[in-house]
Amino acid sequence: MNSRIMFIGGVPGVGKTSISGYIARNTDIDIVLSSDYLREFLRPFAPQESHLETSVYDAWKFYGDMSDDNIIRGYLDQARPIMGGINRVIARALANGEDLIIESLYFVPDMMDEMVLKNAFLAYVYIDDPDLHRSRLEDRINYTHRNSPGSRLAAHLKEYRTIMDYSMDMARGRGIGLYSTDDYALARQRLLDDFRKFVDRR
């Protein structure tokens, strides 16, 4: 039997953690991984130029003044070791015939092997409305991140939404589905339905 693998990307506050849990419960997938923990594991070993010791919203500082280009340069520096790890985790799950969901801030399909891209369901979730996005960040302490106040992240909404726009462009270029979570219940159901269709076609 083929592995059922979902790789879901999105910046903080868009609902990827809770959606991943919802899909796992509704598909009986036991393994759900967050790139936050992969990043924490890699920090002592990652090359210095990846700047993984720095929060992603500050990684632009290694390139000078804040600009969209520098935000993305810092993001991609951090993404390289993370995406390398994600690529290998998915390849291992495929080799073992295991089911897996990975949710990640870092979502750069161009850094993944074509074999992995062909055999995993990729999706990117986002929020259209910046005010709603800010509100969701501030509320997430009540749901999924009880010891991580969202106000700290909301202060960097500009950086996160720059990363979001870049990632959405990359996803469009690869024909990867985009899912607006402005209507959260609708988005998670669409994702679940599309994932099931992907699995059934394989």
Curated annotation (Swiss-Prot):
Organism superkingdom: Archaea
Record keywords, A-Z: ATP-binding, Isoprene biosynthesis, Kinase, Lipid biosynthesis, Lipid metabolism, Nucleotide-binding, Transferase
Keyword Cytoplasm recorded: no
GO aspect biological process, one term: isopentenyl diphosphate biosynthetic process, mevalonate pathway
pH dependence (record): Does not demonstrate significant pH dependence in the pH range of 6.5-9.0.
Pathway: Isoprenoid biosynthesis; isopentenyl diphosphate biosynthesis via mevalonate pathway
Catalytic activity as recorded in UniProt: (R)-3-phosphomevalonate + ATP = (R)-3,5-bisphosphomevalonate + ADP + H(+)
Temperature dependence per UniProt: Optimum temperature is 60 degrees Celsius.
NCBIfam families, A to Z: PRK12339.1 (NF008996)
Name of the protein in its database record: Mevalonate-3-phosphate 5-kinase
